[in-house]
């Protein structure tokens, strides 16, 4: 049985190396990641069961440890590796953002913020800190709350602006409900933060609300579909 499993793993790796990573299905990609099975299940079978249980790659990447471990043969080591791979992708995106993005490229900025915030189960409030040329200095997640609210204070934001010597920033937060409409509370905190930043000569460029597949710009009062 183990010989058959090993041959299966080698076949998948050969397919990837010969035909390219895009030639693999979602389940095959997961199987390559899982790498090895056990005496009873191959890596392909484990990948199939994980996909059947959680539905799709997005759900798998955002699953908690207990959901992941519910598939017999998958444990903390594979889960830790999966989370590390996810964070590597996030950091790679940010490197690109730092090098390439200016304020004029709003779609890429929105796409980056959506990737970072969309799948959080609790409302999370973040900021992109910019220099006076609107180049990215840092991305930081500043506040985290419950499923439908996060308490946000202007003072720590202003302090961080001064520490980073930022000239401007873009705020963003997610709505775990999936809806990107800005609430009255969102509008009120935006105004408070903008007024606080004015006191230190920093400019609030926008506040973005992240839904499931949409982002809403409070300053532009527009929605964009952002898959």
Curated annotation (Swiss-Prot):
CDD domains associated with the record: MPN_DUF2466
* Any single Pfam family the record assigns to this protein: UPF0758_N
* GO terms, molecular function: metal ion binding; metallopeptidase activity
Taxonomic superkingdom:
Bacteria
User: Per its record, how is this protein called by name?
Assistant: UPF0758 protein lpg2489
Per UniProt, Zn(2+) binds at 173, 175, 186
Tell me where in this chain the MPN domain is found: 102-225
Which SUPFAM superfamilies does the record match to this protein? RuvA domain 2-like
Q: Which family does it belong to?
A: Belongs to the UPF0758 family.
Signal peptide range: none
User: One GO BP annotation here?
Assistant: proteolysis
Q: Return the NCBIfam families for the record.
A: PRK00024.1, radc
Q: Which InterPro entries match?
A: MPN, RadC_JAB, RuvA_2-like, UPF0758, UPF0758_CS, UPF0758_N
- Which controlled-vocabulary keywords does the entry list? Hydrolase, Metal-binding, Metalloprotease, Protease, Zinc
> Where does the motif JAMM motif lie?
173-186
Which chain positions lie within coiled-coil regions?
Answer: none
